[in-house]
Amino acid sequence: MVMGTPSSLDEIRKAQRADGPAGILAIGTANPANHVIQAEYPDYYFRITNSEHMTDLKEKFKRMCDKSTIRKRHMHLTEEFLKDNPNMCAYMAPSLDARQDIVVVEVPKLGKEAAVKAIKEWGQPKSKITHVVFCTTSGVDMPGADYQLTKLLGLRPSVKRLMMYQQGCFAGGTVLRLAKDLAENNRGARVLVVCSEITAVTFRGPSDTHLDSLVGQALFSDGAAAIIVGSDPDTSVGEKPIFEMVSAAQTILPDSDGAIDGHLREVGLTFHLLKDVPGLISKNIEKSLDEAFKPLGISDWNSLFWIAHPGGPAILDDVEKKLGLKAEKMRATRHVLSEYGNMSSACVLFILDEMRRKSKEDGVATTGEGLEWGVLFGFGPGLTVETVVLHSVPV
């Protein structure tokens, strides 16, 4: 047996790695055609769940919807389907089979819609895709949604797949962190990332003893987003980054046990939220910013462009207040919350898309609202925070 010399191993490792940072080369989004107008939703929700007798609770839910700052949400579940599946409309009735039957089919399908758009924008043959990262909080099967997507798109059978289930709202940051490592450590890699979320697993009727469940019913919605990530873009074929990823970190916030919990049981996926989630995030967010931007010598948070998971308006309000952010910093985030609701892991990718679109429309110098450096935050169960440092590119 011939042992390789350290120098030759070093050379092999160096040759395997990319030279430059991972960049987001394309973005695509998709939503179910069915949508609800938030102002009309309380009447619809209490009618479809046979809960119109719960008048006080309905008034509370109306106030939640009013405060949500959401205008509309897309949902796969239609009134006709819910009428045919009354157990999904009860508060805690066994209904997992019906829910799973929907999402194991529809999550990959919605993901495919977003992926097709991203691949079209990228402009390269899909045979160049080397890795697939698929993320969803909805539905678990083997083989998983990553396999189904690979088949639906007709990707090469040798594509390297990674499936992320049950991560929750912070996972839009997680997929970027993983895709960054894959792209930078595998020369020539092109990573297709898909986040696809359908609320069929969480929809249920109201309960006057579990108001935290109602919060989710007022916020959550359906959507899928896809990106292509790669290092060393091939400009000869038109590849160009929209944003570059500089660093990525994950942390569990102190004293946050039980702040956000999700449990997949016979009744579907139930979420439990403590009231102090906005306070926990805002109290700890500056530490994450300091750690991420100290190497760059940046401490003025208003000098950054912002992509924050819109868990709800209270989180955004508290973060703005704590950091002294100007109102326009969260414009793209609040726009996505208003037009789409909380689509869990897909949200931050929608916000990236909205930011690059508006930056071009406004004629500013960069994809990051004219600014050079930016931050992307994911918040979710744990309480877990993902922090991604982004670098914009000229428009």
Curated annotation (Swiss-Prot):
Q: What class of enzyme is it?
A: transferase
Q: What is its EC number?
A: 2.3.1.74
Entry's Pfam families? Chal_sti_synt_C, Chal_sti_synt_N
What residues bear N-acetylvaline in this entry?
2
Q: Listed disulfide bonds for this chain?
A: none
Tell me the Gene Ontology biological-process terms attached to this UniProt entry: flavonoid biosynthetic process; polyketide biosynthetic process
Tell me which residues this entry annotates as catalytic. 169
Q: Which reaction does it catalyse?
A: (E)-4-coumaroyl-CoA + 3 malonyl-CoA + 3 H(+) = 2',4,4',6'-tetrahydroxychalcone + 3 CO2 + 4 CoA
From the UniProt record, give the pathway where this protein acts.
Secondary metabolite biosynthesis; flavonoid biosynthesis
Q: Which GO terms describe its molecular function?
A: naringenin-chalcone synthase activity
Q: Which UniProt keywords apply?
A: Acetylation, Acyltransferase, Flavonoid biosynthesis, Transferase
Under the heading InterPro entries, the entry gives:
Chalcone/stilbene_synt_C, Chalcone/stilbene_synt_N, Chalcone/stilbene_synthase_AS, Polyketide_synthase_type-III, Thiolase-like
CDD domains assigned: CHS_like
Protein family: Belongs to the thiolase-like superfamily. Chalcone/stilbene synthases family.
According to its UniProt entry, the function of this protein is described as:
The primary product of this enzyme is 4,2',4',6'-tetrahydroxychalcone (also termed naringenin-chalcone or chalcone) which can under specific conditions spontaneously isomerize into naringenin.
User: What is the protein's name according to its record?
Assistant: Chalcone synthase 3
Species the sequence originates in: Sinapis alba (White mustard)
